[in-house]
Amino acid sequence: PFVITSPCIGEKAADCVETCPVDAIHEGPDQYYIDPDLCIDCAACEPVCPVNAIYQEEFVPEDEKEFIEKNRNFFRNR
């Protein structure tokens, strides 16, 4: 699945939300999150993010890896 990382915090442009064909992107208090159970890995969200915050999970930069778990926890606690 894809993961939204720190550049989204405070930005929340929402271009990705409109692009996602399966409505897997949900708004959190400070950023958007991608539901790993709904994400179909189509990558439609990645190029439309104006702050380049979206990565395929295996390509998340080392200093942003905490967002993989943060993303999972967001949906685990819903």
From Swiss-Prot:
InterPro entries found in the cross-reference section: 4Fe4S_Fe-S-bd (IPR017896), 4Fe4S_Fe_S_CS (IPR017900), 7Fe_ferredoxin (IPR000813), RnfB_subfamily (IPR050294)
Gene3D superfamilies, alphabetized: 3.30.70.20
Pfam family, one: Fer4
One GO MF term attached to the UniProt entry: 3 iron, 4 sulfur cluster binding
Binding site for [3Fe-4S] cluster: 8, 16, 49
Keywords: 3Fe-4S, 4Fe-4S, Electron transport, Iron, Iron-sulfur, Metal-binding, Repeat, Transport
Residues binding [4Fe-4S] cluster: 20, 39, 42, 45
Cofactor: [3Fe-4S] cluster; [4Fe-4S] cluster
Domain (4Fe-4S ferredoxin-type) ranges: 2-29, 30-59
Entry's cofactor comment: Binds 1 [3Fe-4S] cluster. Binds 1 [4Fe-4S] cluster.
PROSITE patterns cross-referenced by the UniProt entry: 4FE4S_FER_1, 4FE4S_FER_2
Signal in keyword set: no
Function: Ferredoxins are iron-sulfur proteins that transfer electrons in a wide variety of metabolic reactions.
Protein's name according to its UniProt entry: Ferredoxin
Organism: Alicyclobacillus acidocaldarius subsp. acidocaldarius (Bacillus acidocaldarius)
Upper taxonomic lineage: Bacteria, Bacillati, Bacillota, Bacilli, Bacillales
